């Protein structure tokens, strides 16, 4: 009997192998399958050394959990935490040795963030990781006086990120957050474990079979929900989900920068990062990797970067070239020696994640393990080739005698050996590849930094024009009523077909609909595999956004289980979506863009919900909420009318003559919320006093804040607190408010 996705083919533990042509039901043995083990890929070995041939057993060890999170990267960790914190059981798998993804195993430990990350652009749990990373250095080392005074202490003092660090710091932070749930039994982590197949019954994934590369053991997971948090969307093809690889055509998406024709093989480059230290006492040249001349002689390796806007900048190794933001060394430096004092100082190291070690090859998203292995090996050779070029052929320039340790990165002494100071010298042989920082044997990251995944065909697809500053002329990107998170980063495309390019964006939201696949009930994306396009993914793939995606996915499935509904049902119901948004905001997840309302601020929850529901808060000139500012009478009466669901009052700010505010007053007065007036149009621009709301307080039973005088102007923060109390009382009774 041939196995199909709509049947178990026998016993519940017997698995479906339709994707590989397996037979099940116990009538025939499963056929061998080739499986990629990313940790076995080596530049010194043929690609087949990174592929194992496995024969899945008809029965695997059965493990049941409420939610299976496949992939313990940035999104997977956030999702697992959200589910476990709700009291549901979680199984979390990871094919490398480290949890944390971009922050750890992929080596991108200089966080790609927006400038408001600490004041409104990140979730509370993401900020907790950042705080723990800083604490790691404060606890293990003695900081310099300047670093100790710096509230925003950056261990690496790099110029591309506000927080750069060794992966070990993030690993410790993340593991400490996961540990309580492991101890309680709510969370089980399966390291070096990879999903091999998935079985379906109708539109539900019923089991996922996974293999452990260290124990050779097989596990059959039987969860209620599956979250695909893999770096390349591995569960999507295994589960038969509809997805998009590569680039869409302009006629499909209407995106200005989309190509005329779709190209499934046109994905962004990926990168094996590596870490260098500087030891001026000796040389540390690595062997020339295979096929080095193919890239080296072609000028592939360079300090110059083409920014696709007609501007090319050429950097120097240890000093800043005119017109550049900083030196090559300080670009993604993870530890700056100038930040530390005393004998027990960490070694200064720099992460190398540069166009020179980007690799282009479509095979990474192939279903063929041998093709994937070939691409990964070539990517490793590319990165090692860049390291070789830096040591042997990079343009050399003497450093100024007055250089500082912070700017030069000379952790092992200010000068360089006599032979390196020669005018005709090329390369920096004092640069040392440091494998221990990345936990690998060859000095390269355990997993390549993935910029583009398979992307699920979701209920909502985010397009370039939804977030691009060229299309969105306001202070924020397009408003998504079903927002479950926020992010902000340029559309940053490391293109393999048309050259790298970057598009400015507006601060954007993550719509719930982008997390819900078409045609599947219990499989959700939880990383960079959500409903984006080849282009819009360039802004949604970064650390804090991927974390927010994973956290939202975790909260969504938690809500679905508690209320016995599917995510698709939630996505189609405004009130259910609203309840998910409340759950997110209550745990410190911003869903609306403010740059001055961080999760720890007292007014965070109220400001977020009122703005997202189109009731009160935002303006069209900046990202501020301005909690200490005043509220006009016109703003207050219009907000109250919106909250009560009187759709006759639009969400846009009233015109100068305040006709809309006067209409709101008429409606409110007729229902006993306000005195009948009359109100002169000019009076509506005055500051709101709590005495103006006496009748509304009496009618609703929501009292004004006790610390606010009756005739004192109400602050925006205090008014939001009062209004939010009323909002929570009216949940389920008012009509949905229009968008702000």
Identify the residue ranges that each predicted region occupies.
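Bacterial N-terminal signal peptides that target proteins for export
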Residues: 1-10
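Bacterial N-terminal signal peptides
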Residues: 9-21
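Boundary at the C-terminal end of the N-terminal hydrophobic targeting segment
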Residues: 23-26
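Flavin (FAD/FMN)-binding glycine-rich loop and adjacent Rossmann-like elements that form
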Residues: 29-48, 58, 102, 190-195, ...
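Conserved N-terminal/central alpha/beta ligand/cofactor-binding core
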Residues: 32-38, 88-89, 94-193, 197, ...
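Beta1/beta-strand and adjacent pyrophosphate-binding region of the FAD-binding site
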Residues: 59-73
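Mature catalytic domains of secreted/periplasmic carbohydrate-active enzymes
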Residues: 74-75, 84-127, 134, 212-221, ...
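N-terminal propeptides
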Residues: 576-740
């Amino acid at each position: 009997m041939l196995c199909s996705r709509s049947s178990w083919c026998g016993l519940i533990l017997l698995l479906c192998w339709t994707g590989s042509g397996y037979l099940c039901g116990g009538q025939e043995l499963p056929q061998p399958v080739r499986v990629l083990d990313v940790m076995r890929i080596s530049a010194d070995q043929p690609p087949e050394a990174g592929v194992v041939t496995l024969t899945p057993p008809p029965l695997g060890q059965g493990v049941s959990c409420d939610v299976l999170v496949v992939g313990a990267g940035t999104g997977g960790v956030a999702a697992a935490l959200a589910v476990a914190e709700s009291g549901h059981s979680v199984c979390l798998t990871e094919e490398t040795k480290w949890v944390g993804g971009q922050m750890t195993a992929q080596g991108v430990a200089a966080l790609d963030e927006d400038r408001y990350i600490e004041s409104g652009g990140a979730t509370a749990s993401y900020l907790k990781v950042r705080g723990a990373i800083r604490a790691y250095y404060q606890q293990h080392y003695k900081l310099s006086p300047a670093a100790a005074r710096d509230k925003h202490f950056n261990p690496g003092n790099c110029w591309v990120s506000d927080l750069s660090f060794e992966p070990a710091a993030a690993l410790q932070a993340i593991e400490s957050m996961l540990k309580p749930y492991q101890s309680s039994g709510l969370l089980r982590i399966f390291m070096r474990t990879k999903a091999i197949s998935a079985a379906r019954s109708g539109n539900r994934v019923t089991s996922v079979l996974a293999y452990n590369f260290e124990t050779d053991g097989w596990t059959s997971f039987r969860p209620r929900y599956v979250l695909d948090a893999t770096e390349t969307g591995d569960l999507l093809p295994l589960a038969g989900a509809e997805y998009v690889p590569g680039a869409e055509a302009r006629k499909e998406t209407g995106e200005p920068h989309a190509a005329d024709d779709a190209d499934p093989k046109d994905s962004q480059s990926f990168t094996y990062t590596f870490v260098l230290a500087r030891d001026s006492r000796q040389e540390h040249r690595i062997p020339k990797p295979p096929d080095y001349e193919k890239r080296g002689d072609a000028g592939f390796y360079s300090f110059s970067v083409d920014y696709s806007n007609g501007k090319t900048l050429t950097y120097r190794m240890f000093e800043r070239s005119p017109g550049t933001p900083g030196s090559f060394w300080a670009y993604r430096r993870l530890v700056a020696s100038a930040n530390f004092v005393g004998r027990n100082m960490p070694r200064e190291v720099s992460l190398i994640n540069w166009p020179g070690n980007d690799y282009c090859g479509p095979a990474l998203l192939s279903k063929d393990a041998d093709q994937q292995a070939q691409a990964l090996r070539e990517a490793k050779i590319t990165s090692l080739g860049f390291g070789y070029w830096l040591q042997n052929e990079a343009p050399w320039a003497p450093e100024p005698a007055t250089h500082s340790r912070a700017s030069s990165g000379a952790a092992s002494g200010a000068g360089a050996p006599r032979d390196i100071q020669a005018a005709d010298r090329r390369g920096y042989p004092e640069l040392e590849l440091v494998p221990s920082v990345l936990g690998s044997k060859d000095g390269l990251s355990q997993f390549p930094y993935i910029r583009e995944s398979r992307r699920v065909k979701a209920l909502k697809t985010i397009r370039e024009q939804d977030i691009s500053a060229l299309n969105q002329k306001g202070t924020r990107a397009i408003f998504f009523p079903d927002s479950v998170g926020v992010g902000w980063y340029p559309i940053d495309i490391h293109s393999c077909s048309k050259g790298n390019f970057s598009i400015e964006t507006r601060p954007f939201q993550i719509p719930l609909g982008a997390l819900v696949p078409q045609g599947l009930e219990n499989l959700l994306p939880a990383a960079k595999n959500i409903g984006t396009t080849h282009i819009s993914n360039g802004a949604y793939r970064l650390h804090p956004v991927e974390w927010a995606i994973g956290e939202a996915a975790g909260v969504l499935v938690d809500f679905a289980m508690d209320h016995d509904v599917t995510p698709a049902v939630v996505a189609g119901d405004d009130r259910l979506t609203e309840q998910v948004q409340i759950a997110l905001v209550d745990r410190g997840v911003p869903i609306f863009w403010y740059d001055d309302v961080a999760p720890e601020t007292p007014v965070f929850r109220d400001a977020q919900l009122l703005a997202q529901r189109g009731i009160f808060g935002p303006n069209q000139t900046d990202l501020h909420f301005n909690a200490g500012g005043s509220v006009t009478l016109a703003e207050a009466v219009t907000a109250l009318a919106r909250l009560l669901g009187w759709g006759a009052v639009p969400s846009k700010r009233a015109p100068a003559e305040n006709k809309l505010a006067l209409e709101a007053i008429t409606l409110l007065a007729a229902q006993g919320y306000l005195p009948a007036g009359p109100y002169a149009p000019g009076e509506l621009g005055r500051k709101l006093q709590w005495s103006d709301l006496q009748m509304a307080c009496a009618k609703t039973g929501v009292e004004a804040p006790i610390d606010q005088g009756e005739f004192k102007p109400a602050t925006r923060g205090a008014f939001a607190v009062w209004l939010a109390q009323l909002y929570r009382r009216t949940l389920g009774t008012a009509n949905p408010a229009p968008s702000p």
